[in-house]
């Protein structure tokens, strides 16, 4: 042994064999898929599968997008039709009032009494139609003035308390608790001393 190959006193001596210097035992061996009979898919196969999955997902996305667009268009059409035909039922009910007025005008020898009774019946039809669609009349004579329901046209001296409706010049109307026309009224200033 030469000086370089001599073992040092604190290091064990190593020997080299013709086989590999480290021998594997059966427990330490890692098994590959080829050894177990399973064929590992090639990169081309994995790429092809990924492309098919991507195409499926893209197709599903396109269908969902188209369905969403169709729903949006249908909803928009429903809203447009609701605005366009909102008063269809009300209009249908008013046709009977129109028919009554035309029938009254068609009578050639109508007396004042016949004409008046026909107008009263027509007014009843109109009032019934209003009630059916929850249109209520505001006739607030003698009530306290409410600026949400009434429009004051003038202030007058009166025996009634201050801010009381003295006279209704034009009736108002409310649709489902929303004023569609305020009542035009004159309001009491109260007594002057």
Curated annotation (Swiss-Prot):
Composition skew (Polar residues), residue ranges: 14-25
Gene Ontology process terms (BP): protein folding
Cysteines engaged in disulfide bonds, as pairs: none
Residue ranges, annotated region (Disordered): 1-40
The entry's keywords: Chaperone, Cytoplasm, Stress response
One matching Pfam family: GrpE
Keyword Nucleotide-binding: no
Family: Belongs to the GrpE family.
Name of the protein described by the UniProt record: Protein GrpE
Organism: Nitrosospira multiformis (strain ATCC 25196 / NCIMB 11849 / C 71)
GN (gene name): grpE
